[in-house]
Amino acid sequence: RRGELTQAFRDVVDAVIAGGGMVGGLGERYTRVAAAHAVHNGLTVLPQTDKFLHGTKVAYGILVQSALLGQDEVLAQLVQAWQRFNLPATLAALEVDITNREEFDRVIAHTLRPGESIHYLPVTLTPEVLRAAFEKVEYFSR
């Protein structure tokens, strides 16, 4: 605010650089952030997520993508990094209640719309598979 370089600003810069670097290693040309952006798009159906930046929701989506791809080791490492940089590692951090079935079904349906980039992933996608991936992220983030 006053031309000072604060620790909070440094933390944000570190998170952006670290997050961007990790994203590049998550998949091949078409899958790097395929699910991450689709998850962002799905979350936008809930008005309470409007206050969160695009990148914040994509960051959570990266965790879901790792879960979908069965990358448990990567998921564990990313959860630790997200927690260190105060990025959302749980849906609650985005003010989303995974136990609200009606609300969460809307997120899943929107995430899985035809044409969403999540369909580039080399996995069979169903609402149940995607829900399990979200649940896995929540489990790893405890």
At which residue positions do the language-model features occur?
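Active-site segments that bind and position negatively charged phosphate/pyrophosphate groups
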Residues: 1-81
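C-terminal charged capping/lid subdomain of soluble metabolic enzymes
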Residues: 72-142
